[in-house]
Amino acid sequence: MNLSFRWYGADDAVKLQYIRQIPSIKSIVTAIYDVPVGEKWSIEAILKLKNEVESYGLNFDVIESVPVHEDIKLGLKTRDKYIENYKENIRNLSKAGVKVICYNFMPIFDWTRTQVDKVLDDGSTTLVYYKNQLKKMDPLTGELSLPGWDSSYTKDQLSSLFEKYQNVDQEVLWSNLEYFLKQIIPVAEECDVKMAIHPDDPPYNIFGLPRIITNEQNLDRFLKIVDSKYNGLTFCTGSLGCASFNDVVKMVDKYSSQGRIHFMHVRNVKLLFDGSFEESAHYSPCGSLDIVEIMKVLHKNKFDGYIRPDHGRMIWGETGRPGYGLYDRALGAMYITGIWETLEKISKEDK
């Protein structure tokens, strides 16, 4: 297990020197954030970022994310240009020592929540997805903006994108994903870079847009499109676990035993009666997922990929990027570390 931590670059209130102080953190998960989606990342910019990360004694080997341009997801004639740029990004990142690239194939929006500052009983604030709030949301007119969303779109551009997706159902999106994978995975193989798709969050259609990386059946279908270890998963326990139809422990066991999980996002969620959910502390009793069992199957299957604590609450008066404060994610990192250390020692005692 290689424990890592997400960092949003120079503008992140969470500084590298703070992350360095979390015991057992080895790698930084980051990206180039000032280049428009679909354009090339220069080797100079990549090496500058690498040098900054490594100056704090941390590794630069996981990128999250290299975003996929909407023209690729839509299957437009212009997609080949953006796919060629994507290939070049894989090549340049490999030259800098990157081993895993996380990405997603969600139309227009990344992860979606209906509120980013829900106050919990203990006074902390968290991200929530309430279905009654979603009914009142209009992404074309509302003001909600989330860290995963591309904020560069104007309202007119968003409206135009929604119109283009009118003719894209799940099967069309599958076809466009297949086209993309068959282009980029051979490059990833040549460069020894493992591609790791992130599940859709939440794992069902939203705002009338199709979503396909959502459940075990669809993950099986995805992995068979290009049956290569370089075509793998970012397994996000919260993204898949926020839907009751997903057996997260079973799925982690299955895909880690196949060697197809390259990156784990570990967080907990509390499922509500109507299918809504709240993000919780990582500690298993705080939510609906059994983090200990998840870590046990990873350990059993000798998982040696990357793992990071995912979204955290805002605690101890911290403010900043929703879900990405320092304190609660640091607690999550140490919870994960403690479980893993215990499993390691028990395993050695049993031999």
Swiss-Prot record:
One of its GO terms (biological process) is D-glucuronate catabolic process. The keyword Lyase applies. Its EC number is 4.2.1.8. Its cofactor is Fe(2+); Mn(2+). Keywords: Iron, Lyase, Manganese. The keyword Acetylation does not apply. GO terms for molecular function: ferrous iron binding; manganese ion binding; mannonate dehydratase activity. SUPFAM superfamilies: Xylose isomerase-like (SSF51658). It is an enzyme of class 4 (lyase). Catalyzes the dehydration of D-mannonate. Belongs to the mannonate dehydratase family. This is Mannonate dehydratase.
